[in-house]
Regions:
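Periplasmic-binding protein-like
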Residues: 1-2, 31, 83-154
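Flexible hinge/capping segments at coil-to-helix
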Residues: 5-22
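Solvent-exposed coil/turn segments that connect beta secondary-structure elements
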Residues: 7-9, 27, 75-76, 96, ...
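Hydrophobic residues within well-ordered alpha-helices
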Residues: 17, 61-63, 116
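Ligand-binding cleft/hinge of the Venus flytrap
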Residues: 30-52, 78-85, 152-157
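Short helix-initiation/N-cap motifs at beta->coil->alpha
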Residues: 48-60, 96-98
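A ligand-binding cleft/hinge motif common to bilobed small-molecule-binding domains
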Residues: 61-64, 68-88
Length: 161
């Protein structure tokens, strides 16, 4: 995740958010928000939260200077037109996180899960442009420790299951 401000903003770093507004999607991008909000709390930065319905609204609020900063996901920034991103500046980037995982409920028969997995891997192998249009760099089998251990490390360890 990233904390962005309007390019003309006087805010230069995360600590400058003290007593300034930070817009973000309430409940959205859970892991991204969680880690950056934890950093703000650990650094005792007393920001003014502004909860919005969408992440795009948060970004728009920084662009239009309605709020001082916005907390957004890195993927969103790749979807925004250059004429918007050129008016924004990143003042903080959180740790790199794994992309979202596809997870199947236990009640779904394993044969159906395997067919879905095979179809996704076929897209990866046969239609790489389709993956790129979805902002996916690759599809791989998820590994709990490799892919999600970062959350446990940042949140103080413990059982991740």
């Amino acid at each position: 995740g990233q904390v962005v401000v309007h390019r003309d903003s006087p805010l230069q770093q995360l600590s400058d958010l003290d007593r300034h507004s930070l817009a973000y999607q309430e409940g959205g991008q859970f892991s991204t928000n969680l880690l950056i909000l934890r950093t703000l709390r650990e650094q005792k930065i007393d920001f003014l939260p502004r909860f919005l319905d969408t992440e795009s609204s948060a970004l728009r609020s920084a662009f239009l200077r309605k709020y001082d900063a916005a907390l957004v996901n890195n993927y969103l920034m790749r979807l925004v037109p250059p004429q918007v991103t050129s008016q924004l500046r990143v003042i903080h980037s959180g740790p790199a996180l794994p992309p979202p995982a596809f997870i199947a409920r236990r009640r779904i028969p394993p044969v159906v899960v395997q067919k879905f997995r095979d179809a996704l891997l076929a897209i990866r192998d046969d239609q790489p442009a389709l993956l790129e249009s979805l902002l996916m760099t690759d599809l791989v089998d998820a590994d709990l420790d490799r892919d999600y251990g970062i959350m446990a490390r940042h949140l103080g360890g413990g059982d991740r299951r």
